[in-house]
């Protein structure tokens, strides 16, 4: 492997698209024709090589991006197969971060679908050069030219058509190569392994000439010398055209468009040629952004085998035979098994044990890997997704990946006490694999709450918990984390006295409670706190050793508010006076007095119920704006801004979390799946009185 494993010979690519556009089938054919797979796996038979989790084979969708390595010509192609369902966009995001190029697969019948728009935007975010493969050209209703128009209209992309289809629907036979100006026809009986070149059919000559002229007009703009040659009527060679297509693809000046039918085994070999010819090698990318740990400086690090080792972990998977597998993309240097490296994000050392090259769920042990490689490491302990592994002597932190906040949550509880411990272990393992899946405990209800990117996402998590960890669980409805606060200043003087023979209990406290936003002299370090305690005792009215008891009592009791039992936040308590007894006073007595003072004093502060407000961002095509804004208003939302972004609109609104349950499904139906949204916690705000009455009644 090392002989040809030079950086310019590597292509790290992703194959991504909308669900059902045919990504996994396309990948299967690539593996078949590059000699990695001896039998073609069909998704609809549940036998695809890349779809190796049970749930994927049952549902016929790809959930985890399986990584695989294959060869074409003298190049090594590392392929990440990505899911197309909207609930799994995190997998796509993780893949795009470590890729150098991508193939976007489109359904020749449906064209640019909603998830295609999402994936395209994600690829824009990471500046991933890409090309387009219009698949399913054999299907009824397939229309290549309509697809090309949709690339312009819906994605705002600049397509560069380099192939045209020969025949349509069931008569689809092959393609016209606009670079060579030849037709390429496949033999059905040879499962697509045999194909031949012939002259362009007479009825397609004019169309081919028209699109060849468009192609040349676009590529010659990238080179003055070739443009002069072209304008003076000289022939532009195929080599010159290929060089300029490569240049334009890498700089995102345009996106080459190819066509075929992966299912019918037509068009896959020219697609592989295009991957090798036009998509970048790690050398073309050249640098990776990061931070030097010793200086804290942000800088660009060269992608090179001779530089110190640096790699980004982009995925973790539990393998039934090897255990936990960490997928890394090596950006610089090389690594051998047995080496010790450092996780610079967590400042922990990791020893490299087994190193594996993955082919879907088959694996091959390797002793060494270097810049440009994507490998799986077995047995890492402290590394999570987005962490950097680095050379110990020259430490760097590569640009971290950003993951969206979960948008849906459910309560889960084990069906039996025997399942309790197993469930905790299962959930923590699944959360380590997937940064968009979170687990927390609701302290008010004691429930375990799981959070994810959509209902299908959580459904599959629960399914995996059952299958892989043998844990049965009951699924409940989630609850909103309400809070309480006071809205005016109040003062309470309370004496706790207990005498029942022997040592008694005595403590007197005088406390002022005030809303934090009304405190004028608030210290900087207290500005982000939910609760502030201060003692202004002068002259020993309450001895110093008893004051921590007052703070502890208030801290404990504020977890149960006075309206509906939700935690009390955003207030300051100031101890201004008190009294003690030489014998009967104690820390405990002052703790009890503080709790009672809270219970008696807080109702005088005009307490109010608070609810979490989320900042919601919806990205939608223009035509759905009215419906989406109307729906957000009906959810007690307040529209903050509306801005154009490319050929879409971005609506930002503040909406109570309680009104956002089920929103993912509403948005899908309002926009036919074309809009997407994300939400993050913004702040707590008062609940309107009529809503507060309903919440109190439920408690």
UniProtKB/Swiss-Prot annotation:
Subcellular location(s) of the protein: Cytoplasm
Listed GO biological process terms: ribosome disassembly
Pfam families for the chain: EF-G_D2, EFG_C, EFG_III, EFG_IV, GTP_EFTU
A cellular component term, taken from the record's GO annotations: cytoplasm
Keywords, ordered alphabetically: Cytoplasm, Elongation factor, GTP-binding, Nucleotide-binding, Protein biosynthesis
Superkingdom, taxonomy of origin: Bacteria
SMART domains from the UniProt entry: EFG_C, EFG_IV
Binding annotation for GTP: 17-24, 81-85, 135-138
Gene3D superfamilies in the cross-refs: 3.30.230.10, 3.30.70.240, Elongation Factor G (Translational Gtpase), domain 3, P-loop containing nucleotide triphosphate hydrolases, Translation factors
SUPFAM superfamilies: EF-G C-terminal domain-like, P-loop containing nucleoside triphosphate hydrolases, Ribosomal protein S5 domain 2-like, Translation proteins
Domain tr-type G: 8-283
InterPro entries for this protein: EF-G-like_DII (IPR053905), EFG_II (IPR041095), EFG_III (IPR009022), EFG_III/V (IPR035647), EFG_IV (IPR047872), EFG_V (IPR035649), EFG_V-like (IPR000640), G_TR_CS (IPR031157)
GO MF terms held by the record: GTP binding; GTPase activity; translation elongation factor activity
Primary localisation category: cytoplasm
Family: Belongs to the TRAFAC class translation factor GTPase superfamily. Classic translation factor GTPase family. EF-G/EF-2 subfamily.
Function text: Catalyzes the GTP-dependent ribosomal translocation step during translation elongation. During this step, the ribosome changes from the pre-translocational (PRE) to the post-translocational (POST) state as the newly formed A-site-bound peptidyl-tRNA and P-site-bound deacylated tRNA move to the P and E sites, respectively. Catalyzes the coordinated movement of the two tRNA molecules, the mRNA and conformational changes in the ribosome.
UniProt protein name: Elongation factor G
Organism: Rickettsia rickettsii
Gene name of this polypeptide: fusA
């Amino acid at each position: 492997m090392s002989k040809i494993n030079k950086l310019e010979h590597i292509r790290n690519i992703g194959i991504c698209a909308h669900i059902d556009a045919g990504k996994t089938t396309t990948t299967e054919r690539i593996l078949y024709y590059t000699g990695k797979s001896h039998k073609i796996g069909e998704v609809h038979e549940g036998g695809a090589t890349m779809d190796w989790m049970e749930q994927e084979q049952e549902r016929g969708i790809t959930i985890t991006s399986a990584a695989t390595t294959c060869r074409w010509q003298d190049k090594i192609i590392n392929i990440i197969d990505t899911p197309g369902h909207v609930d799994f966009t995190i997998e796509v995001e993780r893949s795009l971060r470590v890729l150098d190029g991508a193939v976007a697969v489109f359904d020749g019948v449906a064209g640019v679908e909603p998830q295609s728009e999402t994936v395209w935007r994600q690829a824009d975010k990471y500046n991933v050069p890409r090309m387009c493969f219009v698949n399913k050209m054999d299907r009824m209703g397939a229309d290549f030219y309509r697809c090309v128009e949709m690339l312009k209209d819906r994605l705002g992309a600049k397509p560069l058509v380099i192939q045209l289809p020969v025949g349509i629907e069931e008569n689809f036979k092959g393609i016209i190569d606009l670079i060579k100006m030849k037709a390429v026809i496949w033999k059905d009986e040879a499962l697509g392994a045999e194909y031949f070149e012939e002259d362009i059919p007479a009825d397609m000559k004019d169309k081919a000439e028209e699109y060849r002229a468009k192609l040349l007009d676009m590529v010659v703009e990238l080179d003055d010398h070739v443009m002069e040659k072209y304008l003076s009527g000289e022939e532009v060679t195929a080599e010159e055209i290929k060089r300029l297509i490569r240049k334009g693809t890498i700089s995102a000046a345009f996106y080459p468009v190819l066509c075929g039918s992966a299912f019918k085994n037509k068009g896959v070999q020219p697609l592989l040629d295009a991957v090798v010819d036009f998509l970048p090698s790690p050398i073309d990318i050249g640098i990776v952004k990061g931070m030097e740990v010793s200086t804290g400086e942000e800088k660009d690090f060269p992608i090179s085998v001779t530089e110190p080792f640096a790699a980004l972990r982009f995925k973790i998977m539990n393998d039934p035979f090897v255990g936990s597998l960490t997928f890394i993309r090596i950006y610089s240097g090389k690594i051998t098994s047995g080496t010790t490296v450092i996780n610079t994000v967590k400042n922990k050392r990791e020893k490299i044990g087994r190193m594996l090259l993955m082919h879907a769920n088959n694996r091959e042990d390797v002793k060494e890997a270097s810049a440009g490689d994507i490998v799986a490491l077995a047995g890492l302990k402290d590394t999570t997704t987005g962490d950097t592994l680095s050379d110990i002597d020259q430490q760097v932190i590569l640009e971290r990946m950003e993951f969206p906040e979960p948008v849906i949550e459910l309560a889960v509880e084990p069906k039996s006490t025997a399942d309790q411990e197993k469930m905790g272990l299962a959930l923590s393992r699944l959360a380590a694999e997937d940064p968009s899946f979170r687990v927390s405990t609701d302290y008010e209800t004691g429930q375990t709450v799981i959070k994810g990117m959509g209902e299908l996402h959580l459904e599959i998590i629960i399914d995996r918990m059952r299958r892989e960890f043998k844990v049965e669980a009951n699924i409940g409805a989630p609850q909103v984390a309400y809070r309480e606060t006071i809205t005016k200043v109040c003062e309470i003087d309370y004496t706790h006295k207990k005498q029942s023979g022997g040592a008694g209990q005595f403590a007197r406290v005088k406390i002022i409670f005030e809303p934090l936003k009304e405190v004028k002299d608030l210290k900087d370090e207290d500005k982000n706190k939910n609760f502030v305690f201060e003692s202004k005792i002068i002259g020993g009215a309450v001895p110093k050793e008893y004051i921590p008891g007052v703070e502890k009592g208030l801290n404990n009791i504020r977890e149960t508010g006075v309206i509906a039992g939700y935690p009390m936040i955003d207030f300051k308590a100031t101890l201004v006076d008190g009294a003690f007894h030489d014998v009967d006073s104690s820390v405990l007595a002052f703790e009890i007095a503080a709790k009672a003072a809270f219970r008696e004093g807080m109702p005088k502060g005009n307490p109010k119920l608070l609810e979490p407000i989320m900042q919601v961002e919806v990205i939608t095509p223009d035509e759905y704006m009215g419906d989406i804004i109307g729906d957000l208003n009906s959810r007690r939302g307040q529209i903050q801004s509306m801005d154009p972004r490319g050929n879409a609109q971005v609506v930002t609104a503040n909406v109570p979390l309680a009104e956002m349950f089920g929103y993912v499904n509403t948005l899908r139906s309002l926009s036919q799946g074309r809009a997407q949204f994300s939400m993050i916690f913004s702040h707590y705000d008062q609940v309107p009185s009529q809503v507060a009455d309903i919440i109190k009644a439920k408690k």
